[in-house]
Amino acid sequence: MRRRDLLAGAACMAVSSLVPRVGAARGRTPYGGRILLHAPWPLNAIDPHRVDDMAAAFFGDALFETLYARDADGAFIPSLAEGDPQPDGATLRITLRSDIRFAAGARVDARAAAASIARARAHDAAAWLADVPAPHIDKGVLVFAMRDARRLVRALASPLVAIVPPRFAPDRPDGTGPLRVEIQAAGMVLSRNGIAASGPAFLDAIDVRRAADLVTSLRDFESGADDMGWLGSFLHDPRPGAKSFDAGVIGWAILRTGRDAAAADTPGTAQALADGIPHAALAPLVVGSPWDQGSATWTGAPADLVVRDDAPWLVEVARALCAAMSQPSHEVRCVTLPAAEIAQRRASRGFALMIDVARPIGPGPLGALVGLATADDPASAMALARHPPRGDVAPRVATRTMRIGVVGEIKLQGGRAPDVVLPPSPWGRGVDWGNAFRSR
């Protein structure tokens, strides 16, 4: 039995009836053990309310939860909320469960939830929450001045609207998920959260260590030191008994154009340049299926393509792009910069070209579209969320009207030890780490 399967049957029950069922589930699934892996991504902070936080994309669902969650069948069910929104005149009222606490011990109440929703809106969830008014609190209940319960639940179920405590600090993250996290110099340790809102994880811990390059994970997995291999199963020789896993697309590497790109800084140019890169140039980085290659090339003056220096996978993407885009008199040079400087340049648009990341904000094509639009321009994303296009729009098509272009997919896949079981996330993107276990 999966941990989150318990939520569907227990949403309207008292917590006293939930605990024995969690215990029963533990009897059928091996309990304990650790997983060790190396990740070529920044691991010094994690913020669920940011569309460019890949640590949150990979591990956020294990640490943070939302008022409503998605079950294995794709339906939305109460999670931190006690039940469905209740109509009251022209408003909807949401009561939180009274038994829940953050991993650090503070209570999760209506004030904390309202503050967290406000924080999400102030960061990257504003467009996704465009039709959701800020709640007020009445007798410990969240009150939303709207009538559409289905729309409210869908909005509040987004991972970018996860509930975090007041004064949340990304370098000291705290949540209600099945695992809690400690940021360390070598990476992050996700350990079982004994007071998790939907039950603690099966595993004792997941050690995620920072990889300085793309070789480290493959080498250590091949030798048996690691339990998972990032993007592959071996460096030289296959590991005996190793299994593969593919947890799908959790985001995109994107190309940005900035003010220093001069005439190339126009909507659609970034995607045209990205489409002009041969798939073969990026295929070793596992960026998804081939695309229809275009003919656009960089025709501007020699320029720098900047990328944050603490994301080895992203640096390799940038280097591959520079090699593919450069031509005599139109060279593109890869320049690595500290994350803080990348953020400053992104805010001021003080660059020619930049490699960055984005992730979906919600489910389905609309969630992907709003995530990309938010990465491009939050104001435009707001308008798009209120008036979405008809039908499904592929990411590479959607960005033809933006100053960003999809370079390739960011996938969570590779090799795993034969006894490591990695269930898929109910969102269809990533691993359900709370339900991961080691078979015996």
Q: Where on the chain are the PLM-derived regions?
A:
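Gly/Pro-rich hinge or "lid" segments in bacterial periplasmic/extracellular proteins
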Residues: 150-207, 212-216
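N-terminal lobe/hinge region of extracytoplasmic solute-binding protein
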Residues: 38-89, 118, 174-176
